[in-house]
Amino acid sequence: MSKNIVVLPGDHAGQEIAQEAIKVLEAISEVSPEAKFNFQHHLIGGAAIDATGSPLPDDALAAAKKADAVLLGAVGGPKWGTGSVRPEQGLLKIRKELQLYANLRPCNFASESLLDLSPLKPQHAKGTDFVVVRELVGGIYFGERKEDEGDGVAWDSEKYTKPEVQRLTRMAAFLALQHNPPLPIWSLDKANVLASSRLWRKTVEETIKNEFPQLKLNHQLIDSAAMILVKSPTQLNGIVLTSNLFGDIISDEASVIPGSLGLLPSASLASLPDTNEAFGLYEPCHGSAPDLPKGKVNPIAMILSAAMMLKLSLNLSKEGEAVEKAVKQVLDSGVRTGDLGGSNSTSEVGDAIAKAVKEILA
């Protein structure tokens, strides 16, 4: 049975990296009988605005709702500015419509050969290995707001409910329990100032205590966590659990630790991946890179996002692990794009990973 994957390439570099992820998935299907894919391409972001006037056309959303998983490249660019219709609105809408409440962003080194590229000293960066679990459909990004209407006043509101925090805490706990021994959980908030953070801390505490007493829970204020991240990131190893706004900021800060935004994948899930078949949307942590010439963008974050899709949504864990192994082999061999000090093109890196994954699975 073929897996139905909706591909939303998006804008600029998103279109290039989506092609490379598909290249790797098609290579897998050549050697793995269980891995058969049916790809459907749709518009999102600026490309969709140009073609339809909407950042997320109805047909794209309808197709995504019927798919086994969604692969998304990247959206945005200066062409679409900050007008009333913006590419990023398509992202927010698809997350909300598909109820993708949990965003998972791993932060680790795909290969230790990349340690010298980190802005941190190698002795501080080495061993960094955590997953940011960010709430994705609530909080200040979706709260009530008022624009400045000439009166010089604008505001946004942060609101969380107990069930919203509980389900994300359960996601973090599930991920922690996939390891032996279980990973610690770091819950980040601003409970010394914000009412929403006090509810967050209380709910996380109760949920772990009542449902997962075997897990170690640590609370950390977000500003303190941001300092730890640049001073000694391994202190946060485990599962980092936090709200939409704080997660957006801390995961972007974390994404530079491995040396390039072009390395880190992400998954946005609508349910626990307890059967490895959770519905999810998979995209790189980086943006559309409109300033990069064609053929220069690093496709690894997109390819590793596809690996997460194989493991969490398509029940193809062996194939997902093979992709991760192939990425390490290719990086260690010195085949790299310019952001990693190499001279290879986007497609050359994709070709090398596709070849390596076939050899691993053959």
Curated annotation (Swiss-Prot):
The keyword Manganese applies. Mg(2+) binds at residues 223, 248, 252. One of its GO terms (biological process) is L-leucine biosynthetic process. It comes from the Eukaryota. Transmembrane segments: none annotated. GO terms for molecular function: 3-isopropylmalate dehydrogenase activity; magnesium ion binding; NAD binding. Gene3D superfamilies: Isopropylmalate Dehydrogenase. Keywords: Amino-acid biosynthesis, Branched-chain amino acid biosynthesis, Cytoplasm, Leucine biosynthesis, Magnesium, Manganese, Metal-binding, NAD, Oxidoreductase. InterPro entries: IsoCit/isopropylmalate_DH_CS, IsoPropMal-DH-like_dom, Isopropylmalate_DH. One of its GO terms (cellular component) is cytosol. The keyword Cell cycle does not apply. Its EC number is 1.1.1.85. Pathway: Amino-acid biosynthesis; L-leucine biosynthesis; L-leucine from 3-methyl-2-oxobutanoate: step 3/4. Its cofactor is Mg(2+); Mn(2+). It is found in: Cytoplasm. Substrate binds at residues 95, 105, 134, 223. Its main location: cytoplasm. Homodimer. Belongs to the isocitrate and isopropylmalate dehydrogenases family. Catalyzes the oxidation of 3-carboxy-2-hydroxy-4-methylpentanoate (3-isopropylmalate) to 3-carboxy-4-methyl-2-oxopentanoate. The product decarboxylates to 4-methyl-2 oxopentanoate. This is 3-isopropylmalate dehydrogenase. The lineage of its organism: Eukaryota, Fungi, Dikarya, Ascomycota, Saccharomycotina. The gene is LEU2.
